Amino acid sequence: MRENDVRKRAFAMPLTSPAYPPGPYRFVDREYLIITYRTDPARLRAVVPEPLELDDRNPLVKYEFIRMPDSNGFGDYTESGQVIPVSFRGHTGGYNHCMFLNDEGPIAGGRELWGFPKKLGQPTLRTEIDTLIGTLDYGPLRVATGTMGYKHREADLGQVKAALEEPNFLLKIIPHVDGSPRICELVEYRLEQIALKGAWTGPAALSLTPHALAPVADLPVLEIVSALHIRADLTLGLGRVAHDYLQEPARRPFRASERSLVT
């Protein structure tokens, strides 16, 4: 194979049989169970990278179980993980802290293209009589269980769609061949072409179990704030580099107590 042929075909590995195809990545009948809970603000500060900012007065985590039965190039799979509400340069969004799923294609593609923090796990999302149930197993151990009353009340579709349209942020890290970081970037991406099919709220509960390699319980559940069940079709948009950690220092806005020192 000639060098020019390698360059033309270079998209993903292995070169002759990539783990995932080029996009667009369209998802049909995507289903979410999102349980928002209050946690320890010090724990959040320890895991959210600057220049993203937290609201210390409202330290929240969104625990998500997502069923994806029909996705272009990725197939049929389920995902589970934690998203932390943040702001970046005055715009609110979500920081993807950890994700576990059961499909090689989106694990490889998610990490390589966007920088999703994906690891192999065994999540499920299903309806059992009157209850929506999400679980996450890592190996033989259960590390997360979420439950919600099935379609108790309709949610405000305008608010739900606006939340889905907010930017999301990822910390993309790709090492060099010597182990040093070759790419270390804050990546922003959005969900696009959203067709919201329904959204509901109801009572919910969430249990997280400590695990050395699936440390979702490191952000402990102090109080359940809300729960949301969503069905939608959407496209996963490609990302843009919002901040390059190898090229520029983080620019943190001055706090009120600091402004007086520079005026």
UniProtKB/Swiss-Prot annotation:
Pfam families: ADC. InterPro entries: Acetoacetate_decarboxylase, Acetoacetate_decarboxylase_bac, ADC_dom_sf. It catalyses: acetoacetate + H(+) = acetone + CO2. GO terms for molecular function: acetoacetate decarboxylase activity. Keywords: Decarboxylase, Lyase, Schiff base. Transmembrane segments: none annotated. The keyword Lyase applies. The keyword Aminoacyl-tRNA synthetase does not apply. The active site is at K118. It is an enzyme of class 4 (lyase). Gene3D superfamilies: Acetoacetate decarboxylase-like. Its EC number is 4.1.1.4. It comes from the Bacteria. Belongs to the ADC family. HAMAP family: ADC. Catalyzes the conversion of acetoacetate to acetone and carbon dioxide. This is Acetoacetate decarboxylase 2. It comes from Bradyrhizobium diazoefficiens (strain JCM 10833 / BCRC 13528 / IAM 13628 / NBRC 14792 / USDA 110).
